[in-house]
């Protein structure tokens, strides 16, 4: 992943253009854009292709970043997969459940690493890789891997990690929609031996079981922060994936995690991570 070229799907739109420009200035190796209506044109001095296949064939890109409206995501993502893209980072939110089930099916079938949807993306400061919408003001090279379901809390953790001179080795927003595409085992097959990472901060919340996949992990030092402890049952909080219910009660989750790891009472306790 660290040396691969990147296709920006949605580069020609205002949102995609803005964040692609920031990523390029940061140092990310984005080489092309995708828009069949604007094929042959240049945006940010990057060629715009009519299809993922042509972009992969000509530029040899293996990663795509998705900035397009959710209605079009399924077809573009499946086209990415068939064209040879191996890693897909989806910023778009509110992809329908049916479309996400199809996307997950194809990602599993073709062994694709999919991050999102409704994700701020991923940033790796040491390698100047920014795939998504992370603000770079507080990004500094360090040894803390921040893994979060909430984009806003990720940004706060980044700011506090800089303030406490921890820095970041890698920051990942897994996505806030009800169905996310991330395969934890596949993601860690890429990054689990990432030498720059000393500690991992997992920011969990209501409505998710993904934290449970870390309970028996011992290769790195892990710290947790779980938000939403006072949230009412059966009420969506913030985004569609954040809902507390009797099948995944947050207090039971915290009790289970406490058996294995330290849970921060609030993110200001990030200074406890050493």
Where are these regions (language model features)?
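Catalytic-core regions of core metabolic enzymes
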Residues: 1-274
């Amino acid at each position: 992943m660290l040396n691969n070229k990147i296709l920006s799907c949605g580069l020609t739109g205002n949102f995609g253009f803005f964040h692609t420009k920031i990523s390029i200035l940061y140092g990310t190796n984005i080489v092309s854009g995708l828009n069949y209506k604007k094929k042959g044109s240049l945006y940010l001095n990057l060629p715009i292709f009519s299809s993922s296949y042509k972009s992969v064939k000509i530029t040899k890109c293996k990663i795509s970043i998705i900035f397009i409206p959710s209605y079009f995501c399924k077809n573009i993502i499946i086209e990415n997969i068939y064209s040879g893209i191996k890693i897909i980072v989806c910023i778009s939110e509110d992809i329908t459940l049916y479309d996400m089930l199809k996307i997950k099916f194809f990602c599993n079938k073709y062994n694709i690493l999919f991050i999102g949807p409704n994700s701020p993306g991923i940033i790796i400061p040491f390698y100047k890789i920014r795939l998504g919408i992370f603000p770079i003001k507080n990004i500094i090279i360090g040894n803390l891997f921040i893994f979060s379901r909430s984009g806003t809390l990720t940004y706060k953790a980044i700011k506090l990690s800089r303030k406490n001179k921890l820095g970041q080795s890698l920051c990942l927003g897994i996505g806030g929609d009800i169905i996310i595409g991330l395969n934890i085992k596949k993601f860690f097959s890429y990054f689990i031996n990432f030498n720059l990472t000393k500690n991992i901060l997992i920011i969990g919340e209501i409505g998710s079981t993904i934290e449970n996949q870390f309970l028996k992990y011992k290769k790195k030092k892990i710290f947790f922060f779980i938000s939403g402890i006072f949230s009412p049952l059966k009420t969506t909080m913030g985004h569609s994936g954040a809902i507390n219910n009797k099948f995944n009660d947050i207090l039971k989750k915290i009790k289970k995690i406490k058996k294995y790891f330290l849970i921060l009472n609030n993110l200001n306790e990030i200074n406890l991570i050493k």
